[in-house]
Swiss-Prot record:
The gene is menD. It comes from Shewanella pealeana (strain ATCC 700345 / ANG-SQ1). InterPro entries: DHS-like_NAD/FAD-binding_dom, MenaQ_synth_MenD, MenD_middle, THDP-binding, Thiamin_PyroP_enz_TPP-bd_dom, TPP_enzyme_TPP-bd. Homodimer. Pathway: Quinol/quinone metabolism; 1,4-dihydroxy-2-naphthoate biosynthesis; 1,4-dihydroxy-2-naphthoate from chorismate: step 2/7; Quinol/quinone metabolism; menaquinone biosynthesis. Its cofactor is Mg(2+); Mn(2+); thiamine diphosphate. Belongs to the TPP enzyme family. MenD subfamily. Binds 1 thiamine pyrophosphate per subunit. This is 2-succinyl-5-enolpyruvyl-6-hydroxy-3-cyclohexene-1-carboxylate synthase. GO terms for molecular function: 2-succinyl-5-enolpyruvyl-6-hydroxy-3-cyclohexene-1-carboxylic-acid synthase activity; magnesium ion binding; manganese ion binding; thiamine pyrophosphate binding. It is an enzyme of class 2 (transferase). GO terms for biological process: menaquinone biosynthetic process. It catalyses: isochorismate + 2-oxoglutarate + H(+) = 5-enolpyruvoyl-6-hydroxy-2-succinyl-cyclohex-3-ene-1-carboxylate + CO2.
Length: 569
């Protein structure tokens, strides 16, 4: 058992870990206070290659790291102490695993002799995240374990890893070095060359994409009437290339809220509502072939269309090998980046422009929305459309789960520019949305808007403390309809059950919550007041909260009314 210079050796291992993570592409480290993680915290504090983010709540910290990783397109490290601090990361780790976001959890832990014996703040941490993280269990630091073994273990665990990795780090006390600097030169001699350079100790080649279709396969696939579906796509996948592909083939491209193309004028963004419309549905029923880029489609009607149609050919393009089709249709799955697949030598379809009428139907719905949403009573869809119209390519838009993202999917406007759109639709929880948006905003300092419901905001209220640290414009728009009013859209057996067990009206406002964290706040109940407040907030360097107060049934009644008009059009 190693006892001499324990604190110093603990810190040395922490320093090696943080240095190698920086070399492996980590740019941000998120830390929560705690004693058992001290070797990691002290190492991170002096690591100049990493931006440090501190928060007292590990659940919010995990989601902040998720947002940082989404927006920076790089792995993010999280440091926590032992015990339930680690467990609080679970929701964020699940979301990251499902959506292939690389988080690296570094958890401080008690040594083996203090586990399962009643020692304070000690739980069984290895494999705590089950299948949702790759697991690495480090022993307590020991001079008999060569530093190159530690470095190569980290390299293998993290290189080419697009999902979470949990590195459990056991440390014996003492944890706080107080001796003069200990000489570890002999111990570090095998990695002297590594110390003199900036590359990782072991370098693994990047994984290449899988087999691509031949020219003959492309020609056969485009023979006939087809549809392109842009599902969930990250900004770095360059989804705009799919617009060029659609124009080259002469096929319509229908777009999900998370595709980065929902507002594009050349796309069929109103597909959810068009599948309500008999003439559009009949036209789409003629399609023989489909190519889906991405997965996790939001619209149930679009999911149903893909499941019910008798496709001659069904292709799906995904960046990683996984199953992303709840209907389990027979298909060919290609592993490739969306923009690379779109840039193949595609010939023009033999049935080019077969669905041109769909473009007019899509535009007609936009006209309907302008009349019946933009110029109607103040409400949630009107607010979301107002925000969407004011986005540029240099901004981020994070859309919360439950009702906000569905309203955006159904009613987003057609515009010439739009923001980079972010969501948490892996597990689709309402937890951690505010913290994730803060991470998105902090990653690059781009102006960021968050649209979030009142229940989601209450769920993550203490992440307003994270928002305080954001120095770029961060506008938190809370749609307060006094409860979980997405349940108005669901077939709950009776209204009393809906009120008592689902909607959960709370009668709360967010002004005092914003004041508690020292954030600028405004409450609005008209579209003119909202636009004035929002446009000002987007010029403000820092976070602000706009609470939009709307009636409980406004959104659900408007959705039903518009659906009725669409069906009759």
């Amino acid at each position: 058992m190693q006892t001499e210079h324990t604190a110093e050796l603990n810190l040395l291992w922490g320093t090696l870990i943080l240095e190698e993570l920086a070399r492996l592409g980590v740019k941000h480290v998120c830390m929560a206070p705690g004693s058992r993680s001290t070797p990691l915290t002290l190492a991170a504090a002096k690591q100049t290659k990493l931006s440090q983010h501190i928060h007292f709540d590990e659940r919010g910290l995990g989601f902040m790291a998720l947002g940082l990783a989404k927006a920076s397109q790089a792995p993010v490290a999280i440091i926590t102490t032992s015990g339930t601090a680690v467990a609080n990361l679970y929701p964020a780790v699940i979301e990251a695993w499902l959506t292939h976001v690389p988080l690296i959890v570094l958890s401080g832990d008690r040594p083996p002799e203090l586990i399962d014996c009643g020692a304070n703040q000690a739980i069984i941490q290895p494999a705590i995240f089950a299948q949702y993280a790759k697991q690495i269990n480090l022993p307590t630091p020991d001079l008999n374990i060569a530093p190159q073994a530690l470095l190569s273990l980290l390299d293998e665990a993290i290189c080419n890893q697009s999902q979470p990795v949990h590195i459990n780090c056991m440390y014996r006390e003492p944890l706080y070095p107080n001796e003069p600097k200990v000489d570890f030169e002999h111990y570090l001699a095998p990695v002297k060359q590594w110390q003199q350079h900036t590359a990782p100790y072991s370098q693994f080649a990047n994984l290449t994409s899988g087999l691509m279709p031949t020219a003959d396969a492309l020609a056969r696939f485009v023979h006939g009437k087809g549809v392109i579906v842009a599902a969930t796509l990250a900004p770095e996948q360059k989804p705009e290339q799919l617009i060029e592909l659609a124009q080259k083939l002469g096929w319509p491209i229908v777009t999900d809220a998370q595709s980065q193309l929902r507002q594009h004028p050349a796309a069929i963004g109103n597909i959810d509502q068009l599948l309500h419309q008999p003439k559009s549905k009949a036209l789409l029923a003629q399609a023989e072939r489909v190519i889906v880029f991405g997965g996790r489609i939001l619209s149930k009607r679009l999911i149903g269309y893909l499941a019910e149609q008798n496709w001659k050919d069904y292709w799906q393009v995904l960046p990683q090998q996984q199953r992303l089709d709840p209907s389990h249709k027979p298909k060919k799955v290609w592993i490739a980046a969306a923009h690379q697949f779109a840039k193949l030598a595609w010939p023009r379809s033999s049935q080019a422009n077969w669905a041109l009428k769909l473009v007019q139907h899509n535009d007609d719905l936009e006209t309907l929305y302008q009349q019946q949403i933009d110029n109607a009573e103040f409400g949630e869809a009107q607010t979301i459309r107002a925000i969407a119209k004011r986005q540029t390519a240099e901004q981020h838009l994070f859309i919360g789960n439950s009702l906000p993202v569905r309203l955006y999917d159904m009613f987003a406007p057609i515009t010439t520019s739009s923001a980079n759109v972010f969501t948490n639709r892996g597990a689709s929880g309402i937890d951690g949305l505010l913290a994730t948006a803060c991470g998105v905003a902090a990653a690059e300092g781009k102006p960021t808007s968050l649209i979030i419901g009142d229940i989601s905001a209450l769920h993550d209220l203490n992440s307003l403390a994270i928002a305080r640290s954001v120095t770029s414009p961060l506008v938190i728009v809370i749609l307060n309809n006094d409860g979980g009013n997405i349940f108005n859209l669901l077939p709950v057996p009776n209204e009393q059950l809906r009120t008592d067990y689902y909607r959960l009206s709370h009668g709360l406002e967010f002004g005092f919550g914003a004041a508690m964290f020292g954030l600028a706040y405004n409450q609005v109940d008209s579209i003119s007041d909202f636009i004035e407040s929002y446009e000002y907030a987007m010029t403000y360097s820092g976070p602000s909260v706009i609470e939009v107060t709307v009636a409980q049934d406004q959104a659900s009644e408007q959705i039903a009314q518009i659906a009725s008009w669409v069906k009759q059009s």
